[in-house]
C-alpha cells in the first residue's frame, strides 16, 4: 500500500494531460480540430486553422499543465515520482481517454514538464526548436531535433533524469513518425511564423481602425441629433411666440 499515493499521483498527472485546449478552443469556434488542418490537436494545427491568438492560448495551457503535474509530484514525492508524472502527463496529452485517445503530439506539454524537472535544459531545448523551425519553416523538424538533443542536455544539466529524458525522446519521435516520413519525402508543409505574426498585427490594426470608425460615426450621429433638435425648435418657436390678436383689432377688421 505504500505505493498507492504514487499510483494515484500518476493517474492524476495522466488526467491533467487529458485537458486539451486545442480541442476545447476549436469547439468554441465551432470547429472540430481533429477534422481540420492536419487533424492534430496541438498548437501547430491550431495556428494553421484558428490563428495566432488561439495558438498562443493553446501553447500556454499545454505548457502549464505539464509544469503543474510534475511540480505537484516533486513537492510530494522523490525524483522517481517526478519522472513518472513527466511520462504520465505527456502520455495523457497524446492519448487522452476523455477524447477517445486522440490528442496532440505532446511537445508543448513535454516542454512544460521538462521545465519543472530542470528549467535550463528546457529553455535550451525550446531554443533549438525555435531556431530550427524558424530556419526550416517546419515546426515538426524543430520539435524532433529538440527532443533528440534533450537527453544530451539533461546529461549536462541534470544527469539523474537521463532515463526519463531518453524515454520521452522516443515518445516524441514516435508521435512525429508521420512527419518524419513526409520530411524524408520532402512533402512536409511549411509554417511561416512571421506571416502569422504579421496577420495578427494586421488584425489588431483593423480592430483599432474599426473602433475609431465606430467612435467617429457615433460622434457624427450625436451631432446630427443635436442639429435636428435645433431645427425642430426653430420651426416651432414662431408659432409659440406669435402674439394673439386683441378683441379690438378683430372688431376693427370686421367693420
Predicted regions and their residues:
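Loop-to-transmembrane alpha-helix initiation sites
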Residues: 123, 139-146, 156-171
